[in-house]
Amino acid sequence: MLSAAAAAAVIPKLRFATRPQLRRPAARTYWPRPLSSSSHVTPAAAGAGELEPPDLTRLANAARISLSPQEAEDFEPKIRQVVDWFGQLQAVDLESIEPSLRAGTTADSSLREDKPETFDNRDAIVEAIPSYDDPYIKVPRVLNKE
């Protein structure tokens, strides 16, 4: 039989062996520096608004994605195109455009009131539903089919 001191010394080891505690690194190790347009503007292109493409290897490590050097080389032109496109978007002058909630509307335009409607042919609609359990409509599973 174990003494209390011996049992106390063994129990933490058993707990660690049966259920390891995962040590998560601090958030700072995922992103050594914040990713933003201001941190990725090259000094030479600061006036032109061009963005520097991110380091794919560092991003892949941060996202816990394995990326071979060949894959990184293949993705580099594609990422550069996306970054260039965002650089073009940053160069667009938006000062003369009024802000709106959605395209074609303004902040003072009114949308219809969101309120429930009753349908005259509700019974016909319910009869057409193959699997109806009042008040729910049962549909086939879409995600996680097994």
From Swiss-Prot:
GO MF assignments: ATP binding; glutaminyl-tRNA synthase (glutamine-hydrolyzing) activity
Protein EC: 6.3.5.-
Keyword Plastid set for record: yes
Location of the protein in the cell: Mitochondrion; Plastid, Chloroplast
InterPro entries to which the protein is assigned, alphabetical: Asp/Glu-ADT_sf_sub_c (IPR036113), GatC (IPR003837)
Pfam family, any one: GatC
Domain of life: Eukaryota
GO cellular component, one term: mitochondrion
SUPFAM superfamilies in the record: Glu-tRNAGln amidotransferase C subunit (SSF141000)
Keywords: ATP-binding, Chloroplast, Ligase, Mitochondrion, Nucleotide-binding, Plastid, Protein biosynthesis
Presence of the UniProt keyword Transcription in the record: no
Disordered, as annotated region: 28-53
Reaction catalyzed: L-glutamyl-tRNA(Gln) + L-glutamine + ATP + H2O = L-glutaminyl-tRNA(Gln) + L-glutamate + ADP + phosphate + H(+)
Protein family per UniProt: Belongs to the GatC family.
Complex formation: Subunit of the heterotrimeric GatCAB amidotransferase (AdT) complex, composed of A, B and C subunits.
Additional note from the record: This protein may be expected to contain an N-terminal transit peptide but none has been predicted.
Record-given protein name: Glutamyl-tRNA(Gln) amidotransferase subunit C, chloroplastic/mitochondrial
Annotated source species: Sorghum bicolor
